[in-house]
């Protein structure tokens, strides 16, 4: 989003107290999401992105109804919209957390618009914590990735959806594993372009060249700050805010 919309001020909230979301119940994730959205509305955000596939997968009306006027977007619908354009008669693989895969949301949304496609999903729960710990482009990460992708359920796929916002950081390694034989679909750029188009449509784009980003977490740790700096490629400082008293 910061690359596609460089003039926008970003307020990021990472719920580090409850990581990983992929292991939490639907009800717990919905409760956390509602409180975070309320916090972002109080910060006068003009648009809110649920930048997590696990949270997006289980977001229900109670989550979206937190705001009557602020648009709330998930990271699943824009990707599904793009996949539907190319889905006919293809085998589409999906990898993500247990919560995302267990929800079956990608299968149901894609199949509802493209009944001829074959959607195969695989939970890959070790990938997100591996990335958070900084194991990227190393022997360990390559081994873990290869073990998951070699699973027989993913055999003969034509496209692979990276259904976790962490996974773009290992896109290169996944591409290298497939050696061009599979089209790896990175959600990050798709979602960012969708948000940019929506802001433009609503005349909400910011054209100022002076931007200010704020990064909040529910539980500060030095390791997550280091991880966040790796994600954003800048020297950022995290501010702890306890929303869950």
Identify the role of each PLM range:
Residues 1-245:
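Non-catalytic structural scaffold of enzyme domains
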């Amino acid at each position: 989003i910061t690359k596609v919309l460089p003039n926008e001020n970003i307020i990021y909230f990472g719920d580090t107290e409850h990581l990983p979301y992929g292991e939490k119940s639907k009800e717990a994730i919905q409760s956390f999401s509602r409180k975070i959205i309320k916090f972002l509305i109080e910060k006068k955000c003009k648009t809110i992105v649920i930048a997590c596939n696990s949270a997006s997968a289980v977001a229900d009306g109670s989550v979206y109804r937190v705001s009557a006027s602020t648009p709330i977007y998930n990271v699943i619908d824009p990707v599904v919209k793009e996949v539907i354009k190319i889905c006919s008669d293809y085998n589409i693989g999906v990898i993500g957390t247990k919560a995302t895969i267990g929800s079956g949301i990608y299968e149901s949304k894609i199949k509802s618009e493209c009944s001829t496609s074959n959607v195969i999903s695989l939970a890959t729960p070790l990938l997100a914590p591996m990335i958070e710990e900084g194991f990227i482009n190393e022997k360990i990460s390559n081994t873990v990735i290869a073990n998951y992708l070699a699973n027989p359920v993913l055999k003969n796929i034509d496209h692979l959806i990276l259904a976790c916002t962490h996974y773009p950081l290992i896109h290169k390694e996944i591409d290298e594993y497939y050696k061009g034989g599979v089209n790896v679909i990175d959600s990050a750029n798709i979602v960012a372009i969708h948000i940019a188009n929506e802001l433009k449509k609503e005349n909400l784009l910011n054209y100022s060249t002076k931007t200010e980003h704020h990064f909040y977490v529910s539980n500060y740790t030095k390791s997550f700050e280091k991880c966040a700096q790796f994600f954003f490629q800048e020297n950022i400082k995290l501010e702890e805010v306890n929303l869950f008293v």
